[in-house]
């Protein structure tokens, strides 16, 4: 019985394998015959050539290729393909039209007057085929074969020869529509737009030709001297319209001239820099007026209440011998003179106006601002011109200027103009030395004044970090994000002493910020373990809470008021109390932290972003993955100041800036900076800082004072509390919970067909290992990890 059962199983296996093997054999056979037919090998090859030429005529290769496609389908899919789908039907229609056109051409050549009777078409085709059988393949012209003869005979009988051409054209159009799966309007709309734009261009060229012809006829009647004066007058006419609307002449910012030449220019630049430094994102807060009090009574009362406050976290006192680094440590910028820049700008302005004119937009270029990497053209449209119409011409303007990409700012804030930003042919480097050496940096009392770069007008862009109060930096890899972070850190090291500003650096990538280890400004060594990072952020939150308790006991509202209170106390008492330093927390890669402990990190960042400003704690968060699961809505809502470097898509730009624009940046330090309170971002060329300059600054600072880390702020080693689970379904259950992003006992019972006890044990094990949250009544348990974390673990 066992042998009979085994034989039956083998026979059944043969029956199941036989159909698939049959299709493979048929497919390979057809493929081999097709190759033999193409090469016309032997009697078989020539016979198949005659067979296909009978039906397809001179286009017999189409039939052979169709058989090859059928054989490949047999081998791959092991079954009959659908030969009547929409795309194949379109292909059939086009082939029939080609065969009919070929047959019409054949019979026009064979007959003198081009007219043929209906019956003679098929008969003549058959006679030609028999004649070819006697002479051999390719000896007689067969036109479109029997298929073409049938199509031509039918159409000629019904619609005459011209009607046959019309029917063939209609078949081709229907075939294209079937293949592309579009209707006629969708196919013809781009053609109409192209024709309309070409007509407008031709109309503009015709007008230019007429004007040029008139000018040439006038110039022939004058001497060479008058011709030169005429050209000079024309050049002045080109420049004059750019000065009609604006009071000032066109501005071409020469940002390479860092130092003023005379006293008048010094005063003018100083006024401009003061206007820049008092912009909304670095606006100085007026001092808090405190009520006058008697120094004998109220300070004693507050000191008595302060005795019950928590102890101060920072005990290091001021180092009198510490000297701030000099700007001589940083390199001077290499001034690179760009030749023919004015001529290029005027030529681009003319191209812009001509392009606007060709599209029927009345607009004039009135001012030009040349920046380090981008030149901004201010375009004033006439009354009645929609701004959206100018914005829609961005691709056409880029084509006219032969630019890589352009960015349109519509409108420019505070002006009735549209800004068109065009990349320069030569990019000028901006160094941190020239930014920190500008007039805007003459505020030694501002310890958190950071240098970012130069804007399009060539002015240095600096910002007060304590007014931001937090900063989000995002951009793709290689766009200049790490250089910007280094510039911010070095700006702080150049202005603040260790007792004035403290730094906490979190670098999960372990390569960007390790160079700063040993700097006396650090609270702790650079944190590189993502698991320790959440603990470090929690310690900063605890420090913030302790500071608020100190403020409450001393009757002050913020760190500035508290430090003023301490200064007044130290002037009257022998027991000196240290002032509270600012704390700057720098996270170089937020995405890695969100993968390991998203909930803890997000909660800590949310609390610091909401409350830490008055306590003197400021966040700088950088990430190269600007997605919504990294830059969450909670983080964005509490960090209003943002810097966006070049990103790959408009979606990433909207995640960072709540609007487009970053996808059009050039990279290599080109950024969009949107400070707190600003309506639109400012385009800035970021300051470059080499690794050698960073190392020199770090060596100088370490040489002035050794690091004194705060033991209470150093995160401890995080023990892995996960326990091994003996249940073999545990890994599958975790995978299911992570994929579904929901967890419940009933779901595990249904999916794995287990009892309540076993499913409950699995849920308890997941809660113990930090996969799901605690029990919340009728609500489903919260899943604490995502799919990316599960794969990484």
From Swiss-Prot:
ATP binds at residues 478-483. Residues 458-654 form the FtsK domain. It is found in: Cell membrane. Keywords: ATP-binding, Cell cycle, Cell division, Cell membrane, Chromosome partition, DNA-binding, Membrane, Nucleotide-binding, Transmembrane, Transmembrane helix. The keyword Membrane applies. Residues 212-235 are annotated as: Disordered. One of its GO terms (molecular function) is ATP binding. One of its GO terms (biological process) is chromosome segregation. One of its GO terms (cellular component) is plasma membrane. The chain crosses the membrane at residues 25-45, 56-76, 88-108, 136-156, 157-177. Its main location: membrane. It is a multi-pass membrane protein. InterPro entries: AAA+_ATPase, FtsK/SpoIIIE/SftA, FtsK_alpha, FtsK_dom, Ftsk_gamma, P-loop_NTPase, WH-like_DNA-bd_sf, WH_DNA-bd_sf. PROSITE patterns: FTSK (PS50901). Belongs to the FtsK/SpoIIIE/SftA family. Essential cell division protein that coordinates cell division and chromosome segregation. The N-terminus is involved in assembly of the cell-division machinery. The C-terminus functions as a DNA motor that moves dsDNA in an ATP-dependent manner towards the dif recombination site, which is located within the replication terminus region. Required for activation of the Xer recombinase, allowing activation of chromosome unlinking by recombination. Consists of an N-terminal domain, which is sufficient for the localization to the septal ring and is required for cell division, followed by a linker domain, and a C-terminal domain, which forms the translocation motor involved in chromosome segregation. The C-terminal domain can be further subdivided into alpha, beta and gamma subdomains. The alpha and beta subdomains form the DNA pump, and the gamma subdomain is a regulatory subdomain. This is DNA translocase FtsK.
């Amino acid at each position: 019985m066992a042998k009979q059962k085994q034989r039956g199983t083998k026979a059944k296996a043969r029956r199941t394998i036989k159909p698939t093997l049959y299709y493979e054999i048929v497919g390979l056979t057809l493929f081999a015959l097709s190759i033999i037919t193409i090469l016309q090998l032997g009697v078989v090859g020539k016979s198949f050539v005659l067979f296909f030429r009978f039906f397809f005529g001179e286009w017999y290769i189409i039939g052979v290729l169709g058989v090859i496609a059928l054989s490949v389908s047999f081998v791959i899919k092991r079954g009959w393909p659908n030969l009547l789908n929409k795309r194949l039907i379109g292909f059939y229609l086009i082939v029939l039209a080609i065969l009919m056109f070929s047959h019409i051409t054949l019979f026009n050549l064979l007959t003198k007057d081009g007219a043929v009777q209906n019956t003679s078409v098929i008969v003549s085709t058959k006679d030609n085929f028999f004649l070819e059988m006697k002479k051999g393949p390719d000896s007689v012209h067969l036109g479109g074969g029997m298929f073409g003869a049938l199509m031509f005979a039918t159409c000629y009988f019904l619609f005459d020869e011209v009607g046959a051409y019309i029917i063939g054209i209609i078949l081709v159009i229907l075939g294209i529509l079937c293949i592309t799966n579009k209707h006629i309007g969708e196919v013809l709309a781009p053609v109409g737009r192209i024709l309309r734009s070409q007509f407008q261009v031709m109309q503009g060229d015709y007008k230019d030709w007429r004007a040029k012809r008139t000018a040439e006829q006038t110039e022939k009647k004058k001497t060479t001297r008058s011709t030169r004066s005429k050209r000079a007058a024309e050049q002045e006419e080109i420049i004059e319209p750019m000065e009609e609307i604006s009071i000032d002449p066109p501005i071409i910012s020469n940002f390479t001239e860092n130092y003023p030449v005379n006293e008048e220019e010094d005063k003018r630049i100083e006024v401009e820099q003061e206007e820049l430094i008092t912009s909304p994102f670095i606006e100085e807060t007026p001092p808090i007026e405190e009520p006058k009090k008697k120094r004998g009574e109220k300070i004693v009362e507050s000191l008595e209440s302060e005795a019950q406050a928590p102890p101060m976290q920072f005990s290091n006192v001021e180092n009198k011998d510490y000297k701030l680094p000099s700007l001589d440590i940083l390199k001077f910028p290499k001034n690179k003179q760009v030749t023919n820049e004015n001529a290029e700008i005027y030529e681009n302005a003319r191209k812009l106006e001509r392009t606007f004119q060709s599209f029927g937009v009345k607009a004039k270029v009135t001012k030009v601002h040349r920046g380090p990497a981008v030149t901004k053209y201010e375009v004033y449209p006439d009354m009645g011109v929609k701004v959206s119409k100018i914005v829609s011409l961005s691709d056409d303007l880029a084509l006219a200027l032969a630019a890589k990409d352009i960015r349109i700012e519509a409108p420019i804030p505070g002006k009735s103009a549209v800004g068109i930003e065009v990349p320069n042919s030569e990019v000028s480097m901006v160094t941190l030395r020239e930014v920190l050496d500008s007039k805007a940096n003459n505020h030694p009392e501002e310890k958190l004044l950071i240098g970012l770069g130069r804007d399009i007008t060539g002015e240095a862009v600096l910002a007060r970090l304590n007014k931001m109060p937090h900063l989000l930096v995002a951009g793709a890899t290689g766009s200049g994000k790490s250089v910007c972070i280094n510039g911010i850190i070095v700006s702080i090291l150049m202005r603040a002493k260790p007792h004035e500003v403290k730094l906490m650096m979190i670098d999960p990538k372990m390569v960007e910020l390790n160079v700063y280890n040993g700097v006396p400004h650090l609270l702790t060594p650079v944190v590189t373990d993502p698991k320790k990072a959440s603990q470090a952020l929690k310690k900063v939150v605890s420090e913030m809470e302790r500071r608020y308790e100190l403020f409450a006991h001393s009757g002050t509202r913020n760190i500035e008021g508290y430090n003023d209170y301490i200064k007044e106390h130290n002037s009257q008492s022998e027991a000196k109390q240290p002032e509270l330093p600012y704390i700057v927390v720098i996270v170089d890669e937020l995405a890695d932290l969100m993968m390991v402990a998203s909930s803890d990190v997000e909660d800590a960042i949310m609390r610091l972003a909401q409350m830490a400003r008055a306590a003197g704690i400021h966040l700088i968060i950088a990430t190269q993955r600007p997605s919504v699961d990294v830059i969450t809505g909670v983080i964005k809502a509490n960090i209003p100041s943002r810097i966006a470097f070049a990103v790959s898509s408009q979606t990433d730009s909207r995640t960072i800036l709540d609007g487009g624009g970053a996808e059009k940046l050039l990279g290599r330090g080109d950024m969009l900076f949107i400070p707190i309170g600003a309506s639109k971002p400012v385009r800035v060329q970021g300051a470059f800082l080499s690794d050698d300059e960073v190392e020199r600054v770090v060596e100088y600072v370490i040489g002035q004072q050794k690091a004194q880390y705060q033991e209470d702020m150093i995160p401890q080693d995080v023990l892995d509390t996960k326990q091994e689970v003996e249940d073999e379904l545990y890994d599958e259950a975790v995978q299911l919970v992570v994929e579904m992003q929901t967890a419940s006992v009933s779901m595990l019972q249904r999916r794995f067909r287990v009892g309540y006890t076993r499913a409950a044990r699995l849920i308890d094990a997941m809660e113990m290992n930090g996969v799901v949250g605690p029990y919340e009544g009728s609500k489903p348990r919260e899943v604490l990890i995502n799919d990316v974390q599960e794969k990484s673990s």
